[in-house]
Amino acid sequence: MWLPVYVPLLLVFGVSLSLPHGSLGTDSSSLRGVDADTEKRINVGKTHLQTLRNLETRCHDSLQALVVIDAGSSSTRTNVFLAKTRSCPNKGRSIDPDSIQLIREGKRFTGLRVVLEEWLDTYAGKDWESRPVDARLLFQYVPQMHEGAKKLMQLLEEDTVAILDSQLNEEQKVQVKALGIPVMLCSTAGVRDFHEWYRDALFVLLRHLINNPSPAHGYKFFTNPFWTRPITGAEEGLFAFITLNHLSRRLGEDPARCMIDEYGVKHCRNDLAGVVEVGGASAQIVFPLQEGTVLPSSVRAVNLQRERLLPERYPSADVVSVSFMQLGMASSAGLFLKELCSNDEFLQGGICSNPCLFKGFQQSCSAGEVEVRPDGSASVNEDVRKNRLKPLATYCSVHNPEISFKVTNEMQCRENSIDPTKPLAERMKIENCSIIEGTGNFDKCVSQVESILVAPKLPLPANIEAASSGFESVDQVFRFASSTAPMFITGREMLASIDTLKDHRLLRSDFSGDVEELAEAAREFCSSEVIIRTDGPVIQLPNARGEQKLNSLNFDLCKTMALTVSLLRHMAAGENQPSFIKWEKSIAGPDGKPLADLGWQVGVILHHVLFTEEWGRTAYEAGYSHNL
């Protein structure tokens, strides 16, 4: 008797349960006896609820700012980026990598090396580079280090806030403030060779300061030990490699690059390009290897997926990544002068004849920074910190455990005319030399750059990391490994040297890396003579090719050209040669406007945000409220 009644009740009850999750009861039969106006209001209410329910289940897009602070060898500056971020229920928050754009670079402030050296000058005492220092005693001065870090971070924070306020509209500011701003502060070669605990302590302090910004401006900065830290030379190169290939759209999940083999396994070829990045204190060389490349057992290739530089969904690639200290433009200039002018072939009667300087150019015999005056004379900065040998001379001290306990490191210093047992001033001094004169002999310049910097008998000092990768010098890189991948060369001085030769029509505008064409052009340019005009010194080119003002940026440009020629010759001598070589500062988008400068900054963002699950979790675990 109960069954005919019970079943219909179940059916009716089931329908009523489905209403909140479906159409909200749009069956017209449920509205019998209701007038048209009431029915209209009912439908409006249902539609409103359905709209709100849809909002709960759909993805939401907003803008997020990201700050990368480049703590380089000469200065510290912010790079402020903007990106589209998407949050989806049960999927976390992700960033669209193609939306990342640089909105502005900040001002240049004090480098981290200066912060540490000023602290050591005060609390370890003057000449700490030339005597034993018990580093344990310096723990008592951590509060003072904190104050020095705070002064720098206040400047960086104010500069970042000024950029955000000037570049974002009001709606964007609301979104950026609500999400918080991840900060990635990375030091490169400037403090890479700093020994003892000082460097790591400074980064603990910097992270604390980032996570506790001023509340007045409303922006909530936050970081963690993975985002704010010293990065190795190999990492710096790999991040620059990722930047290049992302901006040039070689890096991605393009189905056209993939195929499924007979076993159903997906294989994706990579069309990646290599990069040579020359900074102030170091140079990085990174390029992909072809499948089947056989490397010596001592050489370590990096797999982008295995080392968690890229997620598994990207095409797999093995790359060579090596970084050389003392091969940056500033550091190599100091080392080159020290070695060249300690050689009897070039030092006669207190005068060092430098084949990499223009004829008629003179300076005092020092590795200090040079300023070319309007009267044509060269003023050399006597400030110890402005001496381009200072970082290397500090490293090459018998009081550095890396030197005192490792004989090979001491030999490398002595090979480069630096005696670790002498005081700092003597380690930076060029013995028996008073004047440096330019001779403008480019071929001899190339041979000296080759023997001192590119293919020295012993590895350049402070290059333990490069040696651990299997390469003791640049010439070994292309002897042991090579690639047909395109190569992009970047770095201010490297670009300036090529642009200068093009400006004087010594190189074709479409120059693509022919080494003999470059050598011939540089040979003619570097044979120029310095002439003093009424409006200042100029470089007078031979064969009536015109002239160019001499200044502090181009007086030693020929050494850069020689380094480029030497580099290209070694690339050409490898088993495989690059398909083409280009010199680029940035990569342009479809509209012809630069997307961002080449360098490691975009790459370090991608390295973190492409691992979407990890990024979404970390961005909240290390968010502003976590650090209150």
From Swiss-Prot:
PANTHER family: ADENOSINE/GUANOSINE DIPHOSPHATASE, GUANOSINE-DIPHOSPHATASE. It comes from the Eukaryota. GO terms for biological process: nucleoside diphosphate catabolic process. The keyword Oxidoreductase does not apply. Belongs to the GDA1/CD39 NTPase family. This is Nucleoside-triphosphatase 2. It comes from Toxoplasma gondii. PROSITE patterns: GDA1_CD39_NTPASE (PS01238). Its EC number is 3.6.1.15. Pfam families: GDA1_CD39. May perform an important processing step in the conversion of high energy nucleotides prior to uptake by the parasite. NTPAse-II has a specific activity 4.5-fold lower than NTPAse-I in hydrolysis of ATP. The primary difference between these isozymes lies in their ability to hydrolyze nucleoside triphosphate versus diphosphate substrates. While NTPAse-II hydrolyzes ATP to ADP and ADP to AMP at almost the same rate, NTPAse-I hydrolyzes ADP to AMP at a much slower rate (0.7% of the rate for ATP). It is an enzyme of class 3 (hydrolase). It catalyses: a ribonucleoside 5'-triphosphate + H2O = a ribonucleoside 5'-diphosphate + phosphate + H(+). Homotetramer. Changing residue 6 to H: In strain: Beverley. It is found in: Secreted; Parasitophorous vacuole.
